[in-house]
Regions:
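Cytosolic catalytic domains that perform sulfur/thiol-centered chemistry
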Residues: 1-183
Length: 183
């Protein structure tokens, strides 16, 4: 990697922040000091964001986030860029970090089983598995897994309604869902 390469990193982590507003200013200050740009969303349910900056600065930001309550095990994905992909740094307060419009859903209370890529290939090959692509219409248009069901949503916020209207179709199936952030 050349010296001028930037680290681009994305994360989301569900946890419980009693006062996300108190986390905002210190995080923004750290990012600005380290030359990091992008967007971080903070909510009572956790943190979500994509940022870019010098590798050492990103490492300092991740250390800061890992020190927050409930975040010691957060995961992130990294890539590189030769040009800064973002114009400014924003740390925003939101009601949800992944917009679903479902205030009574607590993602920490129950999630699906995450599988690694080798398990995924075996899983979606099974005849009793329905594969659902939860990404938006633009992302699905770029490509999807063969046989995946496209809910034809413009945003993830539309997915809960689609599921409520269609879950009866899957009563005898295992469900494998995927999105841009992971499988």
């Amino acid at each position: 990697m050349t010296q001028n390469m930037l680290t681009v990193s994305a994360l989301y982590h569900f946890t419980r922040f009693d006062d996300p507003d108190a986390l905002r200013a210190p995080m923004l200050s750290l990012c600005e000091h380290e030359g990091i740009k992008g967007t971080i969303l903070l909510a009572k349910e956790g943190i979500n964001g994509t940022v870019a900056g010098p590798k050492q600065g990103i490492a300092r930001l991740w250390a800061h986030i890992a020190a927050l309550p409930g975040c010691s095990d957060f995961e992130h994905k990294e890539s590189t860029a030769s040009v800064m992909p973002f114009k400014r740094m924003k740390v925003r307060l939101k009601k949800e970090i992944v917009t679903m419009g479902q205030p009574n859903v607590d993602p920490r209370a129950g999630t699906g089983h995450y599988v690694d890529p080798l398990e995924w290939n075996a899983l979606i090959s099974a005849p009793d598995v329905a594969v659902i692509d939860t990404r938006n219409d633009y992302e699905v248009g770029i490509g999807t897994f063969e046989g995946a069901i496209d809910p034809k949503t413009k945003t993830f916020r539309e997915f809960p309604q689609w599921w409520a209207e269609n879950k009866h179709r899957f009563h005898n199936k295992k469900i494998a869902m995927f999105c841009t952030g992971g499988i």
